[in-house]
Amino acid sequence: MELTLASRDALTELINIGYGRAAGALSELTGYRIMLEVPQISLHEIASIGPMLEDILDGRVASVNQAFTGSMSGNALLLLDESSAIALSRLLSEDRSVDARLDSNAREIITEVGNILLNACLGVFGNLLRVPVSFSVPMLSVDTIPAILESVAHRAREPLQFGLMIHTRFRIKTGNVTGYMVIVLGIASLDRLMRELEQWEQRQMQ
C-alpha cells in the first residue's frame, strides 16, 4: 500500500495542525517559543521501518510510546536518539545542570514532550477525521530500535503491518533537535484511516 499524493497532503495538513497545538502547549509549559517544522511523511511496511530507523538514529534511542484504541488501533511513538533526547531536555529545562545522560529529570521532560506531541496528533485524527480513539498512559524506554519495535508488536492488539514515519524537527531558542514520530497500524486500521482521510478531503471541498 502506498500513500497517494492527496492522502499525503491531507496527512501532512492534519499532522501540522497537531504540531501547531503541541508547539503552543509546549511553549506555554516552558515559557520558551517552540516551533515544530512542517512534517515530512512516508508510509512503509513494518519490516522495513526498523532498518530505516537504525540508519537514521544511532545506538540507543529514547522512545515515548502511546497505544491508542477505538475505531483505529495501533501505537504512536516519538523517537529521539539518546544525544538528541539529552539536547532537547537541556533546551527545555531551566536546570542548567542537566547531566550528559538521560537522568530522571531528562526522562520526565522527554516523556512529557512525547505525551503532548502524540496526544495532539492523535487528537486531531479523532476530532477532524471523526474517528474517536482513546490513549494509554505514555511509556518511556531507552533501547535499540529492534528492541523497541519488538516490544510494541508484542503488546499490540492486532498484527502491525505498516508504519507512518513522520520526520520531526523542534526549533527552540537557538537550538534544533530532530527526531521521528512513527504511527504503526494494522491493515484494517490503515484502511480505515485512508477512508476517513478521503471523506475529510471531500468535506473540505464542500
What are these regions (language model features)?
Residues 1-206:
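Composition-driven recognition of glycine/serine/threonine/acidic- and proline-rich low-complexity segments
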